[in-house]
Amino acid sequence: MSDDEFIDEYDDIYSKLCQEAQDFLIIKDIERIEKPTALEFYREYVSQNKPVIITGLLENWKAYKEWSDDYLENVMKDVEVTVSITNDGLADAVKPINENDPKSERVFCKPFEKKIKFQEYIKHSKKSSKENKNKLAYYIQYQNNSLNVEYDKLLNDIDESVIDFAKEAFGSNIDATNFWMGQDKSVSSLHQDPYENMYCVVRGTKIFTLLPPIDYPFLYKSEFPSASFVNVGCDDNDENIKLEIQIDNDPKMNIPWIPVDPTETLENNIKLGYPLIERAHPITIRVEAGEVLYLPSLYFHRVAQESNKTSNSLSTIAINYWFDMKYGINYVYFQFLKETTKYQKQIKNKNKK
């Protein structure tokens, strides 16, 4: 068998795999349910690695009832928090190193991060909303258990007992609890996490584009030079920040990441060299304020947001709970899929030389 025939055989195997998975691994719609028991949650969703939206859990949260820009500013005041700043709202994403030249080298770019007083973030979001111009995007996305580390003044507004059924189903305690706050410009690029995720939307709407782990062969995960947005302005004051992308040299490294945006048109993805995305199975869902998304471990997801301009917050706000995944048979199957995809890619690259 020639290498080309071998590659075609692999493609055929992937197609058969997806075809057989249609009925039980690939979702075409997402259910909305009321609070389940731990047994129901485990049997119908966790064991099947199946996302679901749960309603009615947050109605008694003080956060859901009272959080507004004014309330949060009054409670947090001059507490310093970590913000991610970018030119385009895309932090931790693959992009051209020269933002004005789409054909320039593609790198994995991290945001410019700095500590500011929370009230400065509120001031910036109000200013950004009024000006409605292409300004810097500020996003609160610090993920190292940020609710407990930087937002502990808000802990009394959250009742984590509403997800006790999830703790029981997962068979573990919460590993990290994170606070998210940002405006419509901020987007999290397509990625996956080794966590079971209970994602609680408090204000606004989170727009998730979900792809099952079985779609891995169609997502072109590759290694890209590590880079960062760097402030080349005269200082870190908001008015003087000027960001440009620079390669990280200390240390120099490559980062494995997915370059594909599943919300782009197929035509654009083909132009970028990603035709296999046509065979993936994306589904876009809206998680509204007061709803909780169960996002299974290893599920690919891209996240955008849409603030409710008539509400008392100009940002979309969410709290999420991470639980360590169980490294069982699903993980073993996924690792096998990764290795076969990697092997096929090596053969393709060999044939190009």
From Swiss-Prot:
This is JmjC domain-containing protein E. It holds the Pfam family Cupin_8. PROSITE patterns: JMJC (PS51184). GO terms for cellular component: cytoplasm. SMART domains: JmjC. The gene is jcdE. Gene3D superfamilies: Jelly Rolls (2.60.120.10). Residues 138-348 form the JmjC domain. It comes from the Eukaryota. One of its GO terms (molecular function) is endopeptidase activity.
